[in-house]
């Protein structure tokens, strides 16, 4: 059987560029080379698409770009992708190793944040007609927007904390009104987040009016819409979901942050900023099963595919479960929760990558299958 050709795409122009590089390096190092030929495509912070065939370890530390730039013949311009980006839809499939054209069989996007997991690049793959790992346009777009995710979770009947949504102009032009609305509905402390930013980028905990105003302005710099959530005194519990139409949930894990909350550094930098415990201790069987049920329901109601990680709070005093958010392209670094949860559930890293690629082909075939309506 001939090998499938997988394009692993990383980088991008989002604030999570560095996270993407580290995740991509891990995927490349662990993918089954007996089953797949790998093409590596990096997107610089300026938006330039470059084919890369240098040392894998140079991806995580950022040195890959200088190496790729020295080989213009190996750049994607041959395939219709210029230094400014995509020039033709078909160019996405025709990535060229050396001077020989060979189409990509499947794309594994290891992209986080805006333009990577928000449905933008997924739409490009759809137009090009290429199977790809992960959620489609709808699930990616809604899953990236925390405010709209909450609206859909509410319709689904999933328990969550109270929240308010504002836009950037309100924060910049009518900050007093914004603060008054928040203080009239929520109590301190509360959390302020950009609606469309992942990995806790731009997220801050506000303990008083002064810190609230500061947090609102930080969030407004990261996105045009701002989400303000009530503080829940809860344990941070996470659950991984895998599949397409019949997804399954992993065991659950707990993040024990040493900081005030599980921020960007805690998620992606090795050190003492947080501790991950799998399985999460001191949770009743009923609570664990309810979390797993909610995770699958969240996955389905957003029309997700392939993979997602769903984050919850379990109240430290009452034991109540609150869904927090969903991540449709969770990190794949050495300390990332998603692969760790599946490893603890019996699916090792390399096998997980293989399953995700198989799910990509399955979804591709399903979305293009013609159904005959037998009803007159």
Swiss-Prot record:
Q: Which domain of life is it from?
A: Bacteria
The record's listing under InterPro entries reads:
ATP-grasp (IPR011761), ATP_grasp_subdomain_1 (IPR013815), D-Ala_lig_Van_CS (IPR000291), D_ala_D_ala (IPR005905), Dala_Dala_lig_C (IPR011095), Dala_Dala_lig_N (IPR011127), PreATP-grasp_dom_sf (IPR016185)
What Gene3D superfamilies does this protein's entry cite?
3.40.50.20, ATP-grasp fold, A domain (3.30.1490.20), ATP-grasp fold, B domain (3.30.470.20)
Q: Where in the cell is it found?
A: Cytoplasm
Residues where ATP binds: 183-238
Question: Pathway, per UniProt?
Answer: Cell wall biogenesis; peptidoglycan biosynthesis
User: What's the Enzyme Commission number for this chain?
Assistant: 6.3.2.4
Pfam family example for this protein?
A: Dala_Dala_lig_N
List the protein's name: D-alanine--D-alanine ligase
Q: Per UniProt, what is the name of the gene that codes for the protein in this document? A: ddl
């Amino acid at each position: 059987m001939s090998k499938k050709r997988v394009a692993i795409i990383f980088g991008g122009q989002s604030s999570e560029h560095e996270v993407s590089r580290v995740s991509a390096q891990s995927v490349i190092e662990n993918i089954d080379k007996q089953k797949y030929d790998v093409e590596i495509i990096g997107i610089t912070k300026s938006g330039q698409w470059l084919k890369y065939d240098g040392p894998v370890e140079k991806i995580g530390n950022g040195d890959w770009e200088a190496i790729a730039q020295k080989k213009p013949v190996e750049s994607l311009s041959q395939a219709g992708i210029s230094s400014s980006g995509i020039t033709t839809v078909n160019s996405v499939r025709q990535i060229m190793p050396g001077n020989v054209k060979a189409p990509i069989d499947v794309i594994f996007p290891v992209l986080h944040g805006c333009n990577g997991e928000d449905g933008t690049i997924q739409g490009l793959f759809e137009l090009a007609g290429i199977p790809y790992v992960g959620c489609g346009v709808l699930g990616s777009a809604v899953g990236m927007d925390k405010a709209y995710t909450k609206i859909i979770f509410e319709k689904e009947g999933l328990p969550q904390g109270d929240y308010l949504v504002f836009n950037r102009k309100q924060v910049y032009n009518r900050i007093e009104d914004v603060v008054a609305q928040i203080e009239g509905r929520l109590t301190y402390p509360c959390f302020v987040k950009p609606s469309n930013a992942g990995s806790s980028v731009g997220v801050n905990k506000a303990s008083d009016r002064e810190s609230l105003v500061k947090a609102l302005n930080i969030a407004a710099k990261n996105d045009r819409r701002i989400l303000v959530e009530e503080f829940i005194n809860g344990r941070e519990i996470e659950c991984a979901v895998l599949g397409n139409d019949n997804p399954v949930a992993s065991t659950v894990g707990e993040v024990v942050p040493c900081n005030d909350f599980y921020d960007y550094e805690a998620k992606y930098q090795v050190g003492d900023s947080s501790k991950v415990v799998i399985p999460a201790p001191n949770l009743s069987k009923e609570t664990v099963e309810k979390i797993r049920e909610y995770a699958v329901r969240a996955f389905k109601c957003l029309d997700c595919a392939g993979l997602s990680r769903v984050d919850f709070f379990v109240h430290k005093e009452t034991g109540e479960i609150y869904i927090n958010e969903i991540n449709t392209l969770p990190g794949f670094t050495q300390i990332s929760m998603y692969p760790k949860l599946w490893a603890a559930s019996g699916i090792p890293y390399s096998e997980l990558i293989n399953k995700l690629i198989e799910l990509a082909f399955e979804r591709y075939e399903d979305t293009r299958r013609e159904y005959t309506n037998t009803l007159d």
